From Swiss-Prot:
Pathway assignment: Amino-acid biosynthesis; L-tryptophan biosynthesis; L-tryptophan from chorismate: step 3/5
InterPro entries in UniProt: Aldolase_TIM, PRAI_dom, RibuloseP-bd_barrel, TrpF_fam
PANTHER family the record matches: N-(5'-PHOSPHORIBOSYL)ANTHRANILATE ISOMERASE (PTHR42894:SF1)
E.C. number: 5.3.1.24
Coiled coil: none
Classification via Gene3D superfamilies: Aldolase class I
Transmembrane segment boundaries: none
Biological source species: Caldanaerobacter subterraneus subsp. tengcongensis (strain DSM 15242 / JCM 11007 / NBRC 100824 / MB4)
GO molecular function: phosphoribosylanthranilate isomerase activity
GO BP annotations listed: L-tryptophan biosynthetic process
Protein name, per record: N-(5'-phosphoribosyl)anthranilate isomerase
Protein's UniProt keywords contain Electron transport: no
GN (gene name): trpF
Enzyme class: isomerase
Length: 203
């Protein structure tokens, strides 16, 4: 079954929603974003998060020491690097599960996968607005050219209305959603519920 990551949790309500709906992963954003949380906030959230839901930290071009501090204090299960990090940088985190985001404009971007040894690639849409969380989708057909030595986490513009089609086309390890389960910029319980049910109903 395809796994679900709900990204950008930033309120206690979001944690309560996750505890009820049990996504496989939840994401805390530590980069510049309207969904950004700091370590103090995240520590409070983690205290209230049910066991079994894996914690992902999202980072963009952060100093190694800062990432390590956050990862160790929160006991993060996955480090998601969404910026211009190199393999040399990623090698600092050999004791962690690492997902590397690749922003997709064309098939040429898939060549970047050859530069990394990571646990999964998160394919996201490219946007001039910034790194991730844009709510924009890309042409999933591009991923037909990807040779699947490393699992795929599909991101970018996913929502209840298109996630089934995306899964059937890409067959990812996991799907990642943020703005697609929000109303007015905040996580919405019913949208989260519908999205998770839709994903888990795909055969």
């Amino acid at each position: 079954m395809v796994k679900v990551k709900i990204c950008g949790l930033r309120r206690l309500e979001d944690i309560y929603y996750a505890n009820q709906l049990q996504p496989d992963f939840i994401g805390f954003v530590f980069s510049e974003s309207k969904r950004r949380v700091d370590l103090k906030e995240a520590l409070e959230f983690v205290k209230r998060l049910k066991e079994g839901i894996k914690k992902v930290g999202v980072f963009v071009n952060e100093p190694v020491e800062k990432v390590m501090e956050i990862a160790e204090k929160l006991k993060l299960d996955v480090l998601q690097f969404h910026g211009d990090e190199t393999q040399e940088y990623i090698d600092n985190f050999k004791n962690f599960t690492v997902w590397k985001a690749i922003r997709i404009r064309s098939k040429l971007d898939l060549k970047k996968t050859g530069e990394f040894k990571v646990d999964a690639f998160l394919f996201d849409s490219f946007s001039e607005k910034g790194y991730g969380g844009t709510g924009e989708a890309f042409d999933w057909n591009i991923l037909k050219a990807y040779k699947r030595e490393i699992p795929v986490v599909l991101s970018g513009g996913l929502k209840e209305e298109n996630v089934e089609e995306a899964i059937k086309l890409v067959r990812p390890y996991a799907v990642d959603v943020s703005s697609g389960v929000e109303v007015g910029g905040y996580k919405d319980f019913n949208k989260m519920k519908s999205f998770i049910e839709k994903v888990r109903g795909v055969v």
